[in-house]
């Protein structure tokens, strides 16, 4: 019997990423874990619907036995079984992030006995989680270089607080992991601005695009009007395509915040990324830790290691026989496997 790994959910950033990473790694390695003080660092601690859906999805995919899978629970015991490929559907029942549920189970399905399709309904445009286009256009091309083949499709948008969105991913077992080397971003090739609208006046999008164009030379400016019943909602995105990597940044519009202020938040975030020679943005760095650890080698550069990144590394090192090295030099932090 494999040893039980004990995790403190209050460590580091104290959010849901500790639980999501633990579920992924437990399914992959077969190691059971117990976690206490789940999401202790959040205003509403414990399992919310999104986290509970991730637990239930993991349980179904590997036939796990679990204790504490209840709303607002702050302690969970998870004993994994064998990961099985198949056609899975999960509903969050709120505007909780569909992509974060996918993020939890897809790594385990890289090791399944056959191809899989996972469909999750819930929120797709959430201010605290990556939208599906980030997964499609930024993360999945990098995963493909690592030998990981998955394809995400956004079937329906779902904005906060209504939800109702649907995202699906098709994924195949990995035959061989390749290492990823992302030391330099390279020169910028082009930048693309994009606005999504659902049940929001078009002039909002036009003002947001104008704000982006006032700070950057945009190769493309796209406004997409979604069906009114998918809203109300508004998301502004800016994609930076460089020689070695494509990064994508976004801000979700909010009531009583002007279009100019929303777009200015995005401008600030992109300028912060471009001010450093680092290849990888803050959020993408979190996403690369697990596949890089599974490959057993690789590196990337990031401007500053976030608390999220450090916490994720700490969890990965509890489950896998790897050690990460973080070295600061020349205005970046180089993250690699020792």
From Swiss-Prot:
One of its GO terms (biological process) is RNA processing. InterPro entries: RNA3'-term_phos_cycl_insert (IPR013791), RNA3'_phos_cyclase_dom (IPR023797), RNA3'_phos_cyclase_dom_sf (IPR037136), RNA3'_term_phos_cyc (IPR000228), RNA3'_term_phos_cyc_type_1 (IPR017770), RNA3'_term_phos_cycl-like_CS (IPR020719), RNA3'P_cycl/enolpyr_Trfase_a/b (IPR013792), RPTC_insert (IPR036553). One of its GO terms (cellular component) is cytoplasm. The active site is at residue 308. It catalyses: a 3'-end 3'-phospho-ribonucleotide-RNA + ATP = a 3'-end 2',3'-cyclophospho-ribonucleotide-RNA + AMP + diphosphate. GO terms for molecular function: ATP binding; RNA-3'-phosphate cyclase activity. It comes from the Bacteria. It is an enzyme of class 6 (ligase). Keywords: ATP-binding, Cytoplasm, Ligase, Nucleotide-binding. Belongs to the RNA 3'-terminal cyclase family. Type 1 subfamily. This is RNA 3'-terminal phosphate cyclase. The lineage of its organism: Bacteria, Pseudomonadati, Pseudomonadota, Gammaproteobacteria, Enterobacterales. The gene is rtcA.
């Amino acid at each position: 019997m494999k040893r039980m790994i004990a995790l403190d959910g209050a460590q580091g950033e104290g959010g849901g990423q500790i639980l999501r990473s633990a579920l992924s790694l437990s399914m992959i390695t077969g190691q059971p874990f117990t976690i206490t003080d789940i999401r202790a660092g959040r205003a509403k601690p414990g399992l919310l619907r999104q986290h509970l859906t991730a637990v239930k999805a993991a349980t179904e995919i590997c036939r796990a036995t679990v204790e504490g899978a209840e709303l607002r629970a702050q302690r969970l015991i998870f004993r994994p079984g064998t990961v099985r490929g198949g056609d899975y559907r999960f509903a969050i029942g709120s505007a909780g992030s569909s992509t974060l549920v996918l993020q939890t189970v897809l790594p385990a399905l890289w090791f399944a006995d056959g191809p899989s399709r996972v469909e999750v309904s819930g929120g797709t445009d959430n201010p605290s989680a990556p939208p599906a286009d980030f997964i499609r256009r930024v993360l999945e091309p990098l995963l493909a270089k690592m030998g990981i083949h998955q394809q995400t499709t956004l079937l329906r948008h779902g904005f906060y607080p209504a939800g109702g969105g649907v995202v699906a991913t098709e994924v195949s077992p990995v035959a061989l992991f390749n290492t990823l080397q992302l030391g330099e971003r390279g020169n910028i090739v082009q930048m693309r601005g994009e606005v999504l609208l659902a049940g929001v006046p078009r002039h909002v999008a036009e003002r947001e695009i104008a704000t982006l164009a006032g700070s950057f030379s945009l190769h493309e400016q796209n406004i997409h009007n979604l069906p009114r019943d998918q809203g109300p909602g508004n998301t502004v995105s800016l994609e930076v395509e460089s020689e070695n990597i494509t990064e994508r940044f976004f801000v979700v519009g909010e009531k009583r915040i002007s279009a100019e202020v929303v777009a200015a938040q995005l401008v600030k975030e992109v300028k912060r990324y471009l001010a450093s020679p680092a290849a990888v943005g803050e959020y993408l760095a979190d996403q690369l830790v697990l596949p890089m650890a599974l490959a057993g080698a690789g590196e990337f550069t990031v401007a500053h290691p976030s608390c999220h990144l450090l916490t994720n590394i700490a969890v990965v090192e509890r489950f896998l026989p790897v050690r990460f090295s973080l070295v600061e030099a020349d205005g970046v932090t180089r993250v690699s496997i020792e």
